[in-house]
Amino acid sequence: MNVAFLDERLLRSLSATLLDVFDELRVYRPDPATLVFVAATKPLDIERQMAATGLPLRRTPLHYARFGINTVEDLVAALVLDDSGVRELASGASLITDNNNRMATSSVYELGRGMSPDATGRILAPYDPLQRPDSFVYRELGGALAFDYIARRLAAFAPLDASLADRIKRIGAALGDSAQGDYVRALGVSVAGRN
């Protein structure tokens, strides 16, 4: 979904509605203007599974490459809301129903009140697993991921979304005193200087 069709309130309500129907929800942002909602009735351990087994990427690499997913790092870079983050974002939001379908009746897009890429990044930042040092990304996958690659991938989109400089800096901070942390922090400073 293009972020221009949503404001923060609609994003929260859409997330709450999906969580009302499905047990699990993750939100990916493959590019600054797009949100992809992945919902399921069973646990979604996509990143963990891919890091451990290479699946499903290993079975059909060309299929996923069309969407820019060539490594587990590509998927982690796109992940902006894991299950705990999306639950926090959606907490207290009103549901979208047939009788109150704000997705169908909203004039957010028509009035130019939709989110920009930068606004989207800033709204999602507190819930983003890459910006939370206590998230599963660092606890469970940290040793298996090339965070320098993730940061470079994000930097490629920084001209379209200024919030990515802050995201990169927070990744560097989460990595602490390490070679990857030093590299990512330096890249974050460089990206911030270009915007």
Which ranges hold each PLM region?
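Alpha-helical linker/edge segments of TPR/alpha-solenoid repeat scaffolds
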Residues: 189-195
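Conserved Class I S-adenosyl-L-methionine
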Residues: 7-29
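Soluble small-group transferase modules, centered on the S-adenosyl donor enzyme superfamily
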Residues: 26-188
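ADP-ribose/adenylate-binding Rossmann-like module
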Residues: 1-4
